[in-house]
Regions:
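Helix-biased detector of long, well-ordered alpha-helical tracts
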Residues: 1-177
Length: 177
């Protein structure tokens, strides 16, 4: 099972900020998430049913998930509808905002990602969005999901969510609706 500890959208909020269009609330949300430390990772690493942990940063969720796939020789199945989004970033994402790194990320590793036709373009871009101090992506056994989510929530990661699972197959990421 794949669990993401923070909401996505930091790069999108940064793009809105650079255009001078980000609200005070959006700025506050961006600062709050980028300054929230991922100390929870030390506790997660102690759990025997946690198999992998990585932080989602410049290559976005899809790129860092692909790293796990390559290391494990498995396929990751992500659900776009389950991806946590920073509330202030949602409208910007839907409006197509984002940094140029979104396109560069896709050019770098898109050949190893399958995106279902029912995934909205903004959802794909959100999964490619580079994060500054992004959330931890945790791969764990199904029986550990409740414990992993409880650890995240207890340490203030209110947007932590199950975003997908690993399966047998080639080292690829599949993003479906």
């Amino acid at each position: 099972v794949l669990i993401l500890g923070k909401g996505l959208g930091v790069g999108i909020l940064s793009a809105a900020l650079k255009k001078g269009e980000l609200s005070d609330a959006g700025y506050a949300e961006m600062i709050a998430t980028t300054t929230q430390l991922n100390r929870v990772g030390a506790d997660l690493a102690e759990l025997p049913a946690v198999h992998a942990i990585t932080d989602v940063t410049g290559f976005g969720l899809l790129g860092h998930t692909l790293e796990i796939c390559r290391g494990s020789k498995l396929t990751a199945n992500l659900r776009a509808s389950a991806l946590p989004v920073l509330p202030q970033a949602l409208a910007w994402a839907q409006a197509g905002y984002g940094p140029g790194a979104i396109e560069r990320n896709w050019a770098s590793y898109g050949q190893d990602v399958d995106v279902s036709a029912d995934v909205a373009e903004w959802q794909k871009r959100l999964a490619l969005d580079p994060q500054t101090s992004g959330g931890l992506l945790v791969a764990c056994a199904p029986e550990a999901v409740d414990e992993v989510l409880a650890l995240f929530k207890a340490q203030g990661f209110g947007l932590a969510a199950v975003v997908g699972e690993m399966s047998d197959g080639a080292a690829r990421v599949v993003l479906s609706a």
